[in-house]
Amino acid sequence: MIFSDFISAFRFRKEFDLNTLKLMVPFAAVGAIVGASTFSFFSEDYLKFILGIMGFLFSFHYFFLKKDADKPAKKNFMKGAICSSIAGFTSFCAHSGGTPTSIYLLPLRLRKEIYVGTRIMFFTCINLVKLPFYIHLSMVNSSSLIHSLALLPLSVFGIFVGYKLLKVIKENVFYNAIYTLILVASAKLIIDFFYALWFRVKQIALVGLSIVSLNYRT
């Protein structure tokens, strides 16, 4: 993934908001370090469920409750710090830092190229922070490196096509598409969580019934 990050960062090297990154990256780095130190204490499923709730409420509010949705929000230090910290933490623990990042960046209504470039630069920085911890925890090895290199040509093609599409899509269509994707992806995370929970409950119930049945027979 880091190779794709470098290629994307090079492509958007002149299209990003440096001031926004100066706020977000340090807090996200702290979040990633905390995640590296504590990830074994947290369930990835529960973290993704929480992110699903956050993303669903965020996108639902945009589509159905917010007035003047196209009006840019002012940069807020506290909101940026909190969202970035959560993004760094969940990026390490659940590989899902996109939702908290979007919650801060999307309302700013940056020009679409600047939004994408800022997001790319942000995650490139965070992945660099995470890399030494992944190596230490053996989460990155020669096998995963070879796999990443094998997918590199496809990544380059995807980056090229994505950049071309970004240039032709209208600003409002772009933002509505992003919010729609967040809504759908968040709903899926919530559904997946409850499906897995139901499956576990059903398994426990079946085990309980089996025990009761055996006791009854004896």
Model-derived regions: residue spans:
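Cytoplasmic-side transmembrane-helix entry/capping segments in multi-pass membrane proteins
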Residues: 19-28, 50-52, 74-84, 117-120, ...
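Hydrophobic alpha-helical transmembrane segments in multi-pass integral membrane proteins
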Residues: 34-39, 89-96, 130, 185-200
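Small-residue-rich hydrophobic segments that form or flank transmembrane alpha-helices
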Residues: 1-23, 83-88, 98-159, 163
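Interfacial loop-to-transmembrane junctions
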Residues: 162-182
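Transmembrane helix exit motif
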Residues: 5-15, 50-75, 163-164, 186-200
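Glycine/small-residue-rich loop that forms an oxyanion/phosphate-binding "nest" at active or ligand-binding sites
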Residues: 18-58
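Membrane-interface helix termini and inter-helical loops of multi-pass transporters
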Residues: 36-45, 134-146, 193-201
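Membrane-interface helix caps of multi-pass small-molecule transporters
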Residues: 33, 37, 41, 64, ...
